[in-house]
């Protein structure tokens, strides 16, 4: 049995501060085990009734992590339950207890004062490729790879987490298309493919790699159609002639098919932009991970053996990655809270200025009314 029984019940763990994450089936807190003093992450699994039972996403996560043991994959330490509320007929909530990491990749990128340097990017991508390679060797697809599911420890070690959408595979099978967060979803899933394999994870890893190189998400759109259009534009695939026949036969092709002419300049080609900043070798690896045809897409072994990692400057050591203060929580939820606070502060300042203009002499004669120039609140930027 892999699990360490650090506590007998969830009540033996002491939660510290506000939640640090919100998952598919519960909320995540930083906590300590009073018996060992170890900091851990507690993910609550809400059990609404005995009939519903343990959520399938939680079952998948436990099953996957019991099969996996790797330095770059988060460790599941315990599964325990909290006592039900007094007088309640509902079962108590269950908790998954994980090793704690003070940051995820979203938080690292948001709070750093400078972009990642090439040796840091190489170090992170190599660790990510190692984690994925091990998963695929164990016949597990992650199917939800994104920056917020990539944890960073205080020592700069990368830990792949959140296996709630993972599943076993033994080659292309009849799987769900409603997996992988939209910005990191490969074109075959956007087009409705149900027979796919581990290379869907490689596309997502390529999106993360490109995000580290560019300093921003590659395909940030709000719908499947718009993400597909963004892929067409940014990958130089605005003509139907550039798409493989296998993808043209998928259910959503007629709805999503690009309308550009063959040879048309997309104008926002990511490879052209990144070639100037990072060179041909980095762009070659990115192209390999973002191949539109999954049959031609590089696999994790191909990533690890790519000349990108042998080219100077070499990858730094994890401990050399400049991370945020490990005493602080720097996760996606913290980034969202920070952006929401900034939005509220801007809105309060705008209303204050509007009221001052309205109260100024001559405002009434000019037709000004308190709040007359108020518009809709700015939309909060979405984090991958």
Identify what each model region corresponds to.
Residues 27-47:
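Glycine-rich ATP phosphate-binding loop
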Residues 124-125:
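Activation segment signature within eukaryotic-like protein kinase domains
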Residues 314-383:
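C-terminal intrinsically disordered, low-complexity extensions immediately downstream
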Residues 16-24, 28:
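Protein kinase glycine-rich loop
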Residues 91-104:
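Conserved short submotifs of the Hanks-type protein kinase catalytic core
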Residues 238-287:
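C-terminal lobe substrate-recognition/regulatory segment of protein kinase catalytic domains
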Residues 69-80:
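Conserved HxN/HPN-centered segment at the entrance to the catalytic loop
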